[in-house]
Amino acid sequence: MHLFKDSLNLIVSSGNGGAGCVSFLREKFKAKGGPDGGDGGRGGDVIFKVKSNLKTLSLYRNGQKLSASNGKSGMGLKKSGAAGSDLIIFVPPNTSIYDADSNCMLFELKNFNDEVVVLKGGRGGLGNVNFKSSTKRTPRFAQPGESGLTLNLRLELSLIADVGLVGLPNAGKSSLISKITASRSKVANYPFTTKIPHFGVVRVSYNDLIIADLPGIIEGASKGIGLGFEFLRHISKTQILVFLIDVSSNDFMSAYDILINELRVYDIGLLKKKRIIVASKLDLEGATENFNQLKSILSEERVLGISIYDNIGINELVSEFFSLAKI
């Protein structure tokens, strides 16, 4: 299983152009044939292309060096060298490409099949046939190929999912994503079952919605406690937030307050995202009463109740996801 990655550095290089050829025609009855050195092939380009089934940057290692192929040298009989193969780097939708040294954003690839040439390969050198003139009938020189270019890039995913499930440890996030998608997010009765985001796809009438089961948040996450900053960074890259609150516990309002406060401290802008409050574990004793209290207290929020085991509210919740995502 690949580790989840939504940011990494790559060092990419385009290919060198091939050298031009110094050659002279040598055929029977043509002892002093003219120059016939062909041009070098161009170096390969570096191309970034969006691939629809990618969700993370896990195909690559942080700091990995990737290079396009060099062009081949020219040959006699005016034959050009072969062009170098392009380097195609596949990335998920919503990938931003930065110059890692200047921190400037160079490109943003949002949609399936978007592509961009980040570096052009070096031009091939001209063969000596190009330098023949009335005063230079036998040029014994050719151009070298142009060198390729190198860039230190940083890739970042600006959006990792349509919906991010947020909650305290053991709120039931992993069970929910397993219920509504084909994901099999690890489910167990201990904190921090989810340590990296897990993804699932909800499909309704040929429309897909990406759901992320994000690591559980605890009080102090905005100060780096627990999975802290990594968790909160992932939250910022989802379109819709779902606060999952265990209403079988009488501390349900405390759970809500912790979630709101940690987001506010880390980045108050996160509170402007679309969100749904989901009361989980309605099948347990006392949960329905707590759910009704939660709806009353949070009367201005979208509040839904679910039971994964009794299949209560699941279809309504999925419909709400699609409504908010406007898919």
Curated annotation (Swiss-Prot):
The keyword Cytoplasm is assigned to this record: yes
Locations listed in the record: Cytoplasm
GO MF, any single term: GTPase activity
EC number: 3.6.5.-
Cofactor(s) in the UniProt record: Mg(2+)
GO biological process: ribosome biogenesis
Gene Ontology CC entries for this record: cytoplasm
Binding site for GTP: 167-174, 192-196, 213-216, 280-283, 307-309
Keywords: Cytoplasm, GTP-binding, Hydrolase, Magnesium, Metal-binding, Nucleotide-binding
Keyword Magnesium attached: yes
Domain Obg as annotated: residue spans: 2-160
Domain of life per record: Bacteria
SUPFAM superfamilies on file: Obg GTP-binding protein N-terminal domain, P-loop containing nucleoside triphosphate hydrolases
Binding residue positions for Mg(2+): S174, T194
Predominant location: cytoplasm
Top EC class, one word: hydrolase
A Pfam family the protein falls into: GTP1_OBG
Domain OBG-type G: 161-326
Protein role: An essential GTPase which binds GTP, GDP and possibly (p)ppGpp with moderate affinity, with high nucleotide exchange rates and a fairly low GTP hydrolysis rate. Plays a role in control of the cell cycle, stress response, ribosome biogenesis and in those bacteria that undergo differentiation, in morphogenesis control.
Oligomer status and interactors: Monomer.
The family this protein is said to belong to: Belongs to the TRAFAC class OBG-HflX-like GTPase superfamily. OBG GTPase family.
Protein known as: GTPase Obg
Organism whose genome encodes this protein: Borrelia recurrentis (strain A1)
Native organism taxonomy: Bacteria, Pseudomonadati, Spirochaetota, Spirochaetia, Spirochaetales
Gene: obg
